[in-house]
């Protein structure tokens, strides 16, 4: 039979609701709330999310102002407590006081958080600059599609200009920071010993070329002689009677500006008795002009790509040869030196020979070094009063302005030529320093620079001339921060080291991946083809002397 159980009724005479709290709900904190409150985030670990004070209480409860569930991180857990959050009316002074106190606390908290993560605390102006930098960086990445760190090309190890064999012994090692401190002032005035060759006159119409009146670069078939020191008949003749150190201007310029070089290069040194001969190896890339060698990100394409370092060097050399002849008044009157070109045979057509003159000069470096150098001029120019000035003509070429932080020459060359030469100085510092050293050694009055660009960025066979610029070598050396005293100091240091070596053949090699040059001793038989030719020449000279 069903039975009715009488429930327990709790009487609350002073109010409504139960008089006692059930056991399962005892000691549970309670915060009044409203179902109309906006829901905030479940968890926010980023700290101060809202910089603007207007949005600080965006998601806070509007019904109950309590913070019973708030967590305060301290050293122990005694901070879990119920606090009285009843709001009291504050005076205007108190409100301002609390506002400033909260701002100071918030600033101190941000400073502690930044110090915890080793972040730099910036002043207000620096913060604005930092935000502007980040904004521009994001804009640049959006426009040009800069790769992220995980997709960036790593710097590949560069190859040496010549393979170092196991039987080569290191005799000396010089690092660039040490060489950059060298200074030498005891350099005498140069003395001209012999001048050979003929020069064509510069066509001043090329000074009026602009980006709007660009001129196509023509392919000019002329012979350029790149004869090394020991193969020069004039130097062989002079070595019998005078001088104890012999070299060409290109070899000396490589040594004098070596601290700017990045790629590997090598120079052969022969110690014969008390004489030194600085040579270049046959069939080497010594005479090729590097492109963007000193840029932050030099070209790294491989294989047959027309933007590979070697193909760019061949393209630059081709451009330099053609421009140095096209800007002259070819086939017309020439300026002739007393002696003919020593490398031209009698049956050769004079118009097929490039306009180059050779000036053999002598310097005294102290009391013990008698230096003889073969220097070159590329052309001659007449002034307003008819005076003759010798010039060196070189070419800067644009291959792709999107690489190596370049600037578009067609847009900037006429209006902002300073920005163009500054970018070239950054990307081709070593090449410009070599050209300047060659002009200083030769005593040229001017250094002519031509600006040549590809007709199309994807076509490395056609080029256009966009303009020219003229510098005095001494002023240009100061402009590119080339110290002549340091250049002579490096050369004197290298000569002194080689003079201390025993008789034989040595190799000066720039390390491909470090700022170091080393002097190797070469065993007998190294570069045997060169040695055989030299022995044959010595035998022929001895036979001629016996006959006379």
UniProtKB/Swiss-Prot annotation:
It is found in: Cytoplasm. Residues 529-548 have a biased composition (Acidic residues). GO terms for cellular component: cytosol; eukaryotic 43S preinitiation complex; eukaryotic 48S preinitiation complex; eukaryotic translation initiation factor 3 complex; eukaryotic translation initiation factor 3 complex, eIF3m; membrane; synapse. Pfam families: eIF-3_zeta. Residues 285-299 are annotated as: RNA gate. InterPro entries: eIF3d. The modification Phosphoserine is found at residues 161, 528-529. The modification N6-acetyllysine is found at residue 53. It comes from the Eukaryota. Keywords: Acetylation, Cytoplasm, Host-virus interaction, Initiation factor, Phosphoprotein, Protein biosynthesis, RNA-binding. One of its GO terms (molecular function) is translation initiation factor activity. Residues 523-548 are annotated as: Disordered. The RNA gate region regulates mRNA cap recognition to prevent promiscuous mRNA-binding before assembly of EIF3D into the full eukaryotic translation initiation factor 3 (eIF-3) complex. Component of the eukaryotic translation initiation factor 3 (eIF-3) complex, which is composed of 13 subunits: EIF3A, EIF3B, EIF3C, EIF3D, EIF3E, EIF3F, EIF3G, EIF3H, EIF3I, EIF3J, EIF3K, EIF3L and EIF3M. The eIF-3 complex appears to include 3 stable modules: module A is composed of EIF3A, EIF3B, EIF3G and EIF3I; module B is composed of EIF3F, EIF3H, and EIF3M; and module C is composed of EIF3C, EIF3D, EIF3E, EIF3K and EIF3L. EIF3C of module C binds EIF3B of module A and EIF3H of module B, thereby linking the three modules. EIF3J is a labile subunit that binds to the eIF-3 complex via EIF3B. (Microbial infection) Interacts with Norwalk virus VPg protein. It is linked to Defects in EIF3D are associated with some cancers, such as prostate, breast and colon cancers. Disease susceptibility may be associated with variants affecting the gene represented in this entry. Down-regulation inhibits proliferation of cancers. HAMAP family: eIF3d (MF_03003). mRNA cap-binding component of the eukaryotic translation initiation factor 3 (eIF-3) complex, a complex required for several steps in the initiation of protein synthesis of a specialized repertoire of mRNAs. The eIF-3 complex associates with the 40S ribosome and facilitates the recruitment of eIF-1, eIF-1A, eIF-2:GTP:methionyl-tRNAi and eIF-5 to form the 43S pre-initiation complex (43S PIC). The eIF-3 complex stimulates mRNA recruitment to the 43S PIC and scanning of the mRNA for AUG recognition. Belongs to the eIF-3 subunit D family. This is Eukaryotic translation initiation factor 3 subunit D. It comes from Homo sapiens.
């Amino acid at each position: 039979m069903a039975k009715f159980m009488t429930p327990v009724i709790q009487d609350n005479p002073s109010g409504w609701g139960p008089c006692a709290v059930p056991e399962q709900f005892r000691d549970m904190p309670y915060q009044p709330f409203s179902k109309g409150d906006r829901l905030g985030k479940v968890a926010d670990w980023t700290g101060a999310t809202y910089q603007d004070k207007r949005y600080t209480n965006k998601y806070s409860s509007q019904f109950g102002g309590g913070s019973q569930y708030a967590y305060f991180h301290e050293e122990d857990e005694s901070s879990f407590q119920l606090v009285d959050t009843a709001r009291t009316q504050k005076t205007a002074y108190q409100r301002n006081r609390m506002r400033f106190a909260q701002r100071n606390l918030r600033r101190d908290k941000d400073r502690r958080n930044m110090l915890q993560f080793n972040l730099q605390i910036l002043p207000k102006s620096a913060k604005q600059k930092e935000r502007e930098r980040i904004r521009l960086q994001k804009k640049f990445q959006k426009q040009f599609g800069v790769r992220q760190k995980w997709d960036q090309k790593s710097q590949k190890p560069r190859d040496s200009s010549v393979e170092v064999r196991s039987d080569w012994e290191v005799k000396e090692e010089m690092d660039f920071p040490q060489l950059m401190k060298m200074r030498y002032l005891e350099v005498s005035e140069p003395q001209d010993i012999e001048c050979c060759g003929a020069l064509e006159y510069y066509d001043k119409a090329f000074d009026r070329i602009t980006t709007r009146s660009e001129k196509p670069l023509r392919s000019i078939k002329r012979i350029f002689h790149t004869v090394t020191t020991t193969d020069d008949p004039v130097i062989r003749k002079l070595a019998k009677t005078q001088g104890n150190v012999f070299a060409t201007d290109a070899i000396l310029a490589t040594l004098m500006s070596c601290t700017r070089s990045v790629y590997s290069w090598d120079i052969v040194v022969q110690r014969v008795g008390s004489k030194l001969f600085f040579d270049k190896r046959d069939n080497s890339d010594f005479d090729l002009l590097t492109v963007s060698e000193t840029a932050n990100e030099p070209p790294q394409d491989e294989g047959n790509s027309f933007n590979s370092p070697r193909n760019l060097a061949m393209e630059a050399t081709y451009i330099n040869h053609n421009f140095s002849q096209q800007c002259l008044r070819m086939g017309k009157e020439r300026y002739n030196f007393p002696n003919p070109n020593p490398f031209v045979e009698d049956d050769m057509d004079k118009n097929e020979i490039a306009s180059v003159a050779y000036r053999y000069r002598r310097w005294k470096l102290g009391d013990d070094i008698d230096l003889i150098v073969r220097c070159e001029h590329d052309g001659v120019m007449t002034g307003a009063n008819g005076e003759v000035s010798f010039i060196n003509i070189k070419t800067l070429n644009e291959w792709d302005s999107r690489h190596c932080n370049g600037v578009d020459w067609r847009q900037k060359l006429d209006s902002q030529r300073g920005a163009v030469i500054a970018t070239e100085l950054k990307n081709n510092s070593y090449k410009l320093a070599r050209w300047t050293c060659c002009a200083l050694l030769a005593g040229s009055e001017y250094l002519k620079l031509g600006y040549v660009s590809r007709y199309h960025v994807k076509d490395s066979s056609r080029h256009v001339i966009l303009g020219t610029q003229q510098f005095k070598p001494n002023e240009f050396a100061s402009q590119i921060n080339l110290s002549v005293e340091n250049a002579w100091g490096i050369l004197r240091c290298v000569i002194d080291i080689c003079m201390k070596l025993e008789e034989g053949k040595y190799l000066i090699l720039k390390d491909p991946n470090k700022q170091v040059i080393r002097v190797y001793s070469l065993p007998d038989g190294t570069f045997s083809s060169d040695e055989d030719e030299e022995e044959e020449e010595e035998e022929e000279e001895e036979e001629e002397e016996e006959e006379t």
